Amino acid sequence: MFDNKNRFVIENYNKQSCFASFLPGISGIHGTPLWNFYVNRGQAICSFGSENKDHSIMEFYPAHQSYQFTKTMGFRTFLKVDGTFYEPFVDDDMPHKMYIGMNELEIEETNEALGIKVNVLYYTMPNERLGGLVRTVTITNLAGAKKDVEVLDGMPALLPYGIALKDMKETAQTTKAWMQVEDVNEKLPYYRVRIALADAAEVSEVEAGNFMVSVNKNGEKLPIIADPELIFDYDTSLTKPVNFYKTEVLALAAEHQLCANQVPAGFACAHEEITDSHTIYSVYGQAGTKELFHTFANAGLDAAYFARKHEENDAIINELADTIATTTADPVFDAYCKQTYIDNVLRGGYPVKLPGGHIFYVYSRKHGDVERDYNFFSMLPEYYSQGNGNFRDVNQNRRSDIYFANFV
């Protein structure tokens, strides 16, 4: 049931009964949170974004549609292993697993015929001025001989900043005319609308943007394809990467891209000779300005940086959960206690003592997710983040605070 990291394990999750969940979106007091929802289908993440549904990076869908669309519209990985095409997490008969941690999610698939294993790890980037979802894709060579591997990894639809949920649900065809991606050739794609989508006489400039950046272990930025037609060609269902079948991936990335007037994609490209393993590190997020994004992306993103951020991510959630650390004869019950406490923190907040004796509650937000699609949740993209909530949610936690945080 649990692995050696105390993560819950689900074997062959694509064949199990549907369920939906979320990463807690806790990025530390001095971090910027994102909301992230996942289901046990495809590559798991079904939607994510900043603040609320009107700031989606991957479009928000309610649960029943997430179960249908995640294999296609969620994250995708296309591989050519010694010339043989393979898309992991699509064939339900291929052995695969899901590992669910308190503040991370990992999926794994093993292809014995090709002699490779693919692991994808997700966690929210902690302690940064901008919010980001970290996605690391590791391809492990299970055979003795070196393998030639081409990789195309990312999202078939990455929404530009400035598009509300209503725009995508009601007028998406019209809204495409505002969409654009900048700086693709610099390997720093910045997704935003040209001008604000407002029926007003005054034109408003949009500074903020959604972004992605992908690097290898040495911190070298990878080429990005933002034009979905360059990958899928005539296949408008986005099922088959038609051009990837017949074109070497780096040559494909070097071709001309149409970066406006369509829903853009976001795929990183790599071509490697793999003896042991190879990892692609990607961050998908939102920044208040392009300058802030460039400062972040050029600050030494390499394997050591992501290892450090992963450790910080674990430390943040464990510090909260240790408040209710329980030791019994049943480790499942002990883990349940920690998870229950984290769930309560998310609903009613975690008390922090400020100078002057003031108490401030961080991390609270209304319990909206893909199943509770009626709730308009909000998580402010700022330090000491908190969100909207119901009075009953706050009161629920105040009863337990007198025991777990007696300074209140």
Model-identified regions with their sequence ranges:
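Anionic coordination/interaction segments
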Residues: 1-408
